[in-house]
UniProtKB/Swiss-Prot annotation:
Keyword Zinc: no
SUPFAM superfamilies linked to this entry: 4Fe-4S ferredoxins (SSF54862)
Alphabetical UniProt keywords: 4Fe-4S, Electron transport, Iron, Iron-sulfur, Metal-binding, Repeat, Transport
Organism: Methanocaldococcus jannaschii (strain ATCC 43067 / DSM 2661 / JAL-1 / JCM 10045 / NBRC 100440) (Methanococcus jannaschii)
Name of this protein: Uncharacterized polyferredoxin-like protein MJ0514
Superkingdom of the source species: Archaea
Matching Pfam families: Fer4 (PF00037), Fer4_21 (PF14697)
Residue ranges of every copy of the 4Fe-4S ferredoxin-type domain listed in the record: 38-67, 69-98, 124-153, 154-183, 191-220, 220-249
């Protein structure tokens, strides 16, 4: 976790600017629980147009990249599962976490960039139809490993020893004369999740809210299919009895 911003400010200083009963406001303020949020965004200058994030997003929350436009996260559809960040072969997707809390009569506000593990990616097969290729060089422009060397309108060379198999070249090729087959590793489970059956009241709100239908009714309780779960935390947020817990693995 990399700290980007850290602010500490006296609670008394903040409350002094608020009208009303200072003693009452101070007591209420100290009972406020920490507020957290998470934001994912794509660095447009680093995006290589491979569209792996678009293809791997389980809730279709990413707009497909085009030659002149990077991929884009659709905020109101994103469930913050971090799969896109794990999948991006060049680390162009950032996960930012913010937290505000009152501690020792101070308001603490921090913004951090979360360290994300990356799925393995490996080239399996590469095909270039040289008869169709117009040697425009767009593929070379977006190749993140400089595996493609092109002389505009004259020649193109691909060094497969350098190719990682991201498929950016195939995505941007105007003639669709490149085919790439890759091996993509499993999503890395950085968190775990459990249902406390003693707290679960069987309201089934979590089942209704799960974006990928990974929760099933289990008698008068619920159970989570961990193989299917994307660990987005939506069920944790909506559970009225705090029966679902999710935590970071060490």
């Amino acid at each position: 976790m990399i700290t980007l911003i850290e602010i500490k400010k006296s609670l008394d200083e903040i409350l002094s600017k608020i009208d009303g009963d200072k003693k009452y406001i101070n007591e209420v303020a100290k009972k406020i629980t920490p507020i957290t949020y998470k934001l994912l965004y794509i660095n447009e200058t680093k995006c290589i147009r491979c569209n792996l994030c678009y293809k791997e997003c389980p809730v279709d929350a990413i707009e497909k990249a085009k030659v002149k436009k990077s991929a884009k996260i659709i905020e109101d559809k994103c469930v913050k599962c971090e799969i896109c960040a794990q999948t991006c072969p060049v680390g162009a997707i950032y996960v930012i976490e913010g937290r505000a809390e009152i501690e020792d009569s101070e308001v603490h506000y921090t913004i951090k960039e979360k360290s994300i593990p990356h799925r393995k990616i490996r080239l399996k097969k590469y095909e270039l139809d040289e008869n169709t290729c117009i040697k425009c060089g767009i593929c070379a422009r977006f190749c993140p490993t400089n595996a493609i060397k092109a002389v505009r309108r004259k020649s193109i060379e691909v060094n497969l020893d350098l190719c990682m198999g991201c498929g950016a070249c195939a995505e941007v090729c105007p003639k669709k004369c490149i085919k790439v087959e890759r091996e993509l590793g499993e999503v890395i489970k950085t968190r775990d999740i459990e249902v406390d059956k003693n707290l679960c009241v069987g309201c089934l709100v979590c089942i209704e809210e799960c974006p990928i239908n990974a929760i099933d009714q289990d008698g008068d309780k619920v159970k989570i299919n961990k193989d299917k779960c994307i660990l987005c935390g939506r069920c944790v947020d909506v559970c009225p009895t705090n029966a679902i817990k999710m935590w970071e693995k060490k």
